[in-house]
């Protein structure tokens, strides 16, 4: 404590600390909107933690454009230039590309080993083993539609977003530690052991196949069916571990008694679902119930469990 206060009382050191603190606050986010020279010759570029590049120009010489110390790089919708090994410094943990970025095939070393978050909107090339660093925890590839081989995606991934993926999933394609997953417009067959037992939250939208028992792992606690699908909900197709359940927005057909597991505490019915509630449809564990916008049926006695404390109409 004495050392700290002796330094703090030194007017020169105090002034220097305040100056650097001001530089950091003023330059922690740098937006490049004219040329890359804005970044190369920025007088306080070393203070930047977030860099947003809004232009379509090459990054330039090997590793010279983006300063070491930056932790987040965002390439917006205009950027569409090659990324080479060493261009992104090893301090970067979060990397995002806009919808116009159509990269070449990546090679080992393209991304730094510090990376934990990668979002590539339009990437649609084959991914080979070790091309993505083993540090990635969140991977979002929105327009990706190339077949994935088992054990290619890093085992470190805990959140995976695969939208528009239309190839048959195989065992071990989805990494074993994934806890949150978005699978949008997947239209191939599901089967047992395709999703890992680590999975807790699943967003499964526009799945146009039947859903059967054991297709989804019993580790799932939050299940959202998005816009549409499955074609039918077979008996026990929703895992008995699910606590938060949202049926697909476009679902209109009658939900049979027994389809909602006893574990569900938070239930959202589809906007256009307008069937009378049958006794026994809603589980006794339910505490929160959200009806769809167009629901206008008379609620009969004993259809809503006494455990429900919140109702949204």
Where do the protein language model's features map onto the residues?
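Concave beta-strand-loop units of leucine-rich repeat
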Residues: 32, 51-58, 74-81, 96-103, ...
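Intrinsic disorder/low-complexity signal
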Residues: 15, 24-25, 36, 71-76, ...
């Amino acid at each position: 404590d004495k050392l700290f206060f002796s330094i703090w009382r030194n007017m020169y050191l105090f002034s220097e600390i305040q100056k650097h603190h001001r530089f950091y606050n003023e330059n922690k986010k740098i937006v490049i909107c004219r040329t890359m020279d804005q970044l190369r010759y920025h007088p306080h570029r070393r203070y930047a933690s977030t860099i947003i590049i809004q232009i379509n120009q090459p990054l330039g010489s090997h590793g010279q454009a983006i300063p070491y110390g930056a932790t987040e790089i965002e390439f917006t919708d205009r950027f569409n230039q090659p990324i080479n090994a060493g261009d992104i410094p090893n301090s970067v943990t979060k990397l995002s590309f806009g919808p116009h970025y159509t990269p070449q095939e990546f090679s080992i070393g393209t991304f730094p080993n510090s990376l934990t978050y990668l979002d590539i909107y339009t990437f649609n090339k084959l991914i080979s083993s070790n091309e993505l660093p083993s540090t990635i925890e969140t991977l979002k590839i929105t327009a990706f539609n190339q077949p994935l081989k088992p054990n290619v995606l890093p085992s470190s991934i805990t959140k995976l977003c695969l939208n528009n993926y239309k190839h048959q999933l195989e065992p071990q394609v989805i990494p074993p530690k994934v806890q949150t997953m978005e699978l949008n417009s997947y239209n191939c067959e599901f089967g047992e052991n395709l999703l890992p037992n680590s999975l807790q939250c699943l967003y499964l939208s526009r799945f146009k196949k039947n859903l059967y028992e054991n297709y989804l792992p019993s580790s799932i606690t939050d299940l959202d069916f998005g816009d549409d699908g499955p074609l039918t909900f077979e008996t026990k197709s929703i895992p008995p571990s699910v606590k938060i359940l949202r049926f697909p927005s476009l679902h209109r057909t009658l939900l049979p008694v027994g389809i909602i597991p006893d574990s569900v505490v938070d239930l959202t019915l589809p906007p256009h679902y307008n069937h009378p509630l049958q006794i026994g449809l809603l589980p006794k564990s339910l505490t929160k119930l959200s009806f769809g916008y167009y629901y206008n049926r008379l609620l009969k006695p004993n259809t809503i469990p006494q455990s429900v404390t919140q109702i949204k109409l």
